[in-house]
A protein has these predicted regions:
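Conserved N-terminal segment of class I S-adenosyl-L-methionine
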Residues: 1-86, 92-96, 109, 139, ...
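Short glycine-centered segments of the SAM/dcSAM-binding site in methyltransferase folds
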Residues: 30, 119-121
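A generic structural signal for alpha->beta connector loops
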Residues: 49, 71, 119, 171-174
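A short hydrophobic/small-residue beta-strand
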Residues: 52, 122-123
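Short N-terminal helix/helix-N-cap motif within the alpha/beta-hydrolase-1
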Residues: 60, 103-107, 134
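A short His-aromatic
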Residues: 97-101
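A short glycine-rich, Lys/Arg-flanked "PGG" loop and its adjoining helix->strand segment in the class I
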Residues: 106-118
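Conserved class I S-adenosyl-L-methionine
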Residues: 123-145
């Protein structure tokens, strides 16, 4: 399932996430890019003078990333269990369009929290499954069926409320989840930032 990462991304959506990421990560920070895929966002961070480490479970996107960006520190990890990264070793963790694919959300969030330093920032994006989006899909049965096709690798679906509650439940504070992108009811993203508690 993970090897099927598309070659290209929606440029508007990618730009939205890039701007969000750069607004939260200062130059000189050490950032972990979780689910780095082909290294697009890791490369953006590196150009912004950020020390970045990218990890992914999929071999093929990482192979392409290493060809395009040989200067980046990109590593393949197992999908479950602890990552070979030191505790509290990153100022920020970025996980763009990843959380919806994770089977063990509790274990995954625990790993994100473990590698974040005290007070570090978690940044993530995921599709917005708010009420207007669901209504739009309900009015277009083919679109609804395609989105929730069991062969699609989205395992979880989030709204602003459910994502906020999830992050707060894992001890993150200053949680800010915003819906961004097209007009309400169109394809939108949740952009979330949260701080790791100091204890």
């Amino acid at each position: 399932m993970w090897e099927g990462v598309p070659e290209g991304l929606d440029p508007v959506d990618e730009g939205l996430r890039r701007a969000f990421l750069l607004a939260h990560v200062p130059a000189g920070a050490r950032v972990l890019d979780v689910g780095c895929g082909e290294g697009r966002f890791a490369a953006v961070l590196a150009r912004a003078k950020v020390e970045v480490v990218g990890i992914d479970v999929a071999a093929e996107p990482l192979r392409r990333a290493r060809l395009r960006h040989p200067e980046l520190d990109l590593r393949q990890v197992q999908g479950e269990g602890a990552w070979p990264l030191a505790d509290a070793s990153f100022d920020a963790v970025w996980a763009g369009e990843v959380i919806e694919h994770v089977a063990d959300t509790a274990g995954w969030l625990s790993e994100l929290r473990r590698v974040l330093r005290s007070g570090g920032e978690l940044l993530l994006s995921t599709p917005d499954h708010g009420r207007l989006q669901m209504l739009r899909w309900a009015l277009a049965p083919r679109v609804f069926d395609a989105h929730f096709d069991p062969r699609v690798d989205h395992l979880r679906f989030y709204t602003r409320r459910t994502l906020t509650e999830l992050l707060e439940g894992f001890g993150f504070h200053d949680v800010d989840v915003r819906s961004a992108g097209g007009p309400p009811g169109a394809r939108r993203r949740l952009l979330a930032s949260a701080r790791r508690s100091r204890f």
